[in-house]
Regions:
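N-terminal accessory segments
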Residues: 1-224, 228
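Hydrophobic pocket-lining residues within nucleotide cofactor-binding pockets
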Residues: 231
Length: 231
């Protein structure tokens, strides 16, 4: 499957490929990601969504798209285990992410939308927030950070959708208040992947013994990268 490129649609392959991704130690997701994406891009619904990526300018359309993507657990599972090596999908999700950030106060929350934003936040964490970000988005994220922080100071829990939107732009574990987010208690995988595991890795990194003091610039940079991502 590693070097296979699909040229026609075959939805019957979705369940076994989903199982392939979720079975532990069976294959490395990044080795089959391009093949799986080539299959998904032959699906008429996915084709239609990708063609509309630059015209998805309304909140209603973005919400509708999140519902349609709910029918593709194969895509969701792939996004939760490895970066998507595909520029079309990247542009598509950049557009979706921006739309929901701009319209957070107007969004009609649904299980499908929460599932989509959960998947998107995990994907952005995995790809180390490589998606391009406009100045407008940076400003809106700063406002969202302040709003969530203020909510917690006032002993109010932020809406899950607000946290997920922030998590698609910034690593949640970097915030001092991340362990106070009870809104994520019903989103176990998000909480584990974006908060609990990174914090555990930080603790492990601190406990790694250092034989001698590091002084040269290159070694300091390497140590800094390792402490950020021990694995």
């Amino acid at each position: 499957l590693k070097n296979v490129k699909f040229i026609s649609s075959n939805p019957e392959l979705y369940p076994p490929l989903t199982q392939l991704l979720t079975a532990e130690n069976f294959t490395r997701p990044k080795d089959v990601a391009k093949s799986i994406l080539s299959l998904l891009k032959q699906d008429i619904q996915i084709k239609d969504l990708l063609l509309k990526k630059n015209s998805a300018v309304s909140l209603n359309e973005a919400t509708s798209i999140s519902r349609k993507l709910d029918k593709f657990p194969l895509l969701h599972n792939l996004m939760r285990v490895c970066p998507l090596p595909d520029l079309e999908f990247e542009k598509f999700f950049i557009t979706m992410r921006r739309l929901f950030l701009r319209n957070l106060n107007k969004v009609e929350v649904s299980p499908e939308l929460i599932y989509f934003l959960s998947t998107l936040s995990i994907q952005c964490f995995i790809n180390e927030y490589v998606y391009i970000e406009s100045d407008e988005e940076t400003h809106l994220i700063s406002e969202l950070e302040a709003e969530i922080s203020q909510n917690l100071v006032q002993l109010m829990q932020p809406e899950a959708i607000n946290i997920l939107c922030l998590a698609s732009y910034r690593p949640l574990h970097q915030y001092d208040w991340c362990q106070k987010l009870e809104s994520l208690d019903n989103l176990g995988e998000v909480k584990k992947r974006l908060i609990e595991e990174p914090l555990l890795e930080k603790m492990i990194a601190k406990d790694i013994p250092m034989l001698e003091e590091i002084s040269d610039d290159v070694s300091l940079k390497v140590r800094g990268q390792y402490e950020e991502n021990p694995y």
